[in-house]
Amino acid sequence: MSGAATTNTPDAVPEFRQVMGHPRPLWMLFMTEFWERFAFYGMRWALALYIVAQFHGGDSAGEAPASRLYGAYLALVYAAALFGGYVADKVIGYQRSILLGAVVMAAGLFMVMWPDESVLKLGLATVIAGNGLFKPNISTMVGKLYSVGDERRDSGFTLFYMGINLGAMVAPLLTGFLAERLLGGSADMPAYKV
């Protein structure tokens, strides 16, 4: 399972140590996707609110530009998967694409925390690029853990998607709680940056 993509011969499935009846790397991919979705949804719930509070003084006039930026961000996050899939297939391979995407996303998430609107926009663009490299390719890696016809493949994908759903479910609850308790949010200026 090299980092480079090959199209002319199917990759042989390497033997992995089994954990709970599945290849050990499945659990690493499960946790990786859990934390990626945690970061995505942990930021997503508060993004428009944060933009209005931080860059428009909480004024309702900031709702329209915040909503436009939020909408553009979400649309581009999902559209970037086309770019990321192509890059993985034709240029750097799935593993390298996932690693590069994770590093780029992390850099973007740190930029989003900077209290400057230009840096926020650059950070969102960076998250978009990283997500495009990461998101379409991690599912491909799950598929490569199992040989064609392996009966465990469906349950492996079910477990993987449980990681996605758990990250999405826990993120808004935990980040909201942390913003309130640790960062001193108040009714007039919630601590939207966790």
Model-identified regions with their sequence ranges:
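Cytosolic juxtamembrane N-terminal segment immediately preceding the first transmembrane helix
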Residues: M1-Y41
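Intracellular juxtamembrane helix-capping segments at the cytosolic ends
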Residues: L133-V148
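Glycine-rich segments within core transmembrane alpha-helices of 12-TM secondary carriers
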Residues: V77, D154-L183
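Short amphipathic helix-loop junctions that connect adjacent transmembrane helices
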Residues: W45-S67, E180
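Cytoplasmic membrane-interface "Motif A"-like loop-to-helix N-cap segments
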Residues: K90-A102, G149-D150
